[in-house]
């Protein structure tokens, strides 16, 4: 019950139970505190309690920063902090984490982290009405992931296609959104043939796509 794997498996479906187990795991010193705080952050984020999610991601980040032993985990926490800052409309703070994280992601050759941080910067710029900069970063994100055969990167690309389509439609850039819709449709067909893609996750992607697609058929 108090293992990292078990709690990581349940925090989405039962975040409150995960938090109870994490308290006990900390008391028992069942696994490293940086991971306990990461899972607390994820559990709170899953409940949309973003301030607490940020607080525990920050605690985990600081532990990594002090030890300097787990650069990959520190990068993961940097991504969380950039995204959570953006969600809370702290755009300058988000930019700080994202820009420092991109350098680390490139050093570690972590394309998933780099893509998440690039898109986060794009979202920040869009919300600050810096639209040209925003679409530049969205484009960089998609170019980084386009053509990847890695399942996680393909799923991430599908999500970013959908997210940018939403921004384009809000800005009445319908032709560009339509072009992305076609690209996403092709990607979803490829994902259907990847055996390790969870079917439930794929169906969610298709459902989101189908919610957007009818707009272009009106």
Task: List PLM regions with ranges.
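A "functional boundary" signal
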Residues: 1-218
